[in-house]
């Protein structure tokens, strides 16, 4: 399943630079291993920047260490070639802005 999500620039850049390989999110979308996160950089002034990342969910933790109704997902950012080969299967345009 593909999940389109807003993400603030600080977190977006940390993921893009491989400094962050997880996402903490409200667990309202039934995230599962193998899902894809379509992360779109978003400014608080209600606008998208055009920068996007596609990441695959590798692990989902739901437990006592999480905030109530939240989960922690281990993610892997997909490279350009993988996005190209997976895009038709998951329904993502291949002109994503950060590859």
List each model region and its residues:
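Short, charged beta-turn/beta-strand-edge "cap" motif at the junction between a beta-strand
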Residues: 42-47
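Short beta-strand/loop turn elements enriched in aromatics
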Residues: 1-20
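Short alpha-helix capping/helix-loop boundary micro-motifs
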Residues: 20-27
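Glycine- and charge-enriched low-complexity intrinsically disordered segments
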Residues: 60-99
């Amino acid at each position: 399943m593909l999940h389109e999500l807003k993400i603030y620039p600080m977190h977006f850049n940390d993921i893009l630079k491989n400094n962050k390989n997880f996402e903490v999110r409200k667990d309202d979308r039934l995230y599962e291993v193998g899902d894809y996160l379509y992360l779109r950089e978003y400014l608080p002034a209600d606008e998208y920047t055009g920068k996007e990342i596609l990441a695959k969910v590798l692990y989902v933790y739901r437990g006592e260490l999480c905030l109530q109704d939240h989960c922690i997902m281990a993610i892997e950012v997909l490279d350009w070639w993988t996005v190209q080969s997976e895009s038709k299967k998951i329904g993502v345009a291949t002109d994503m802005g950060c590859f």
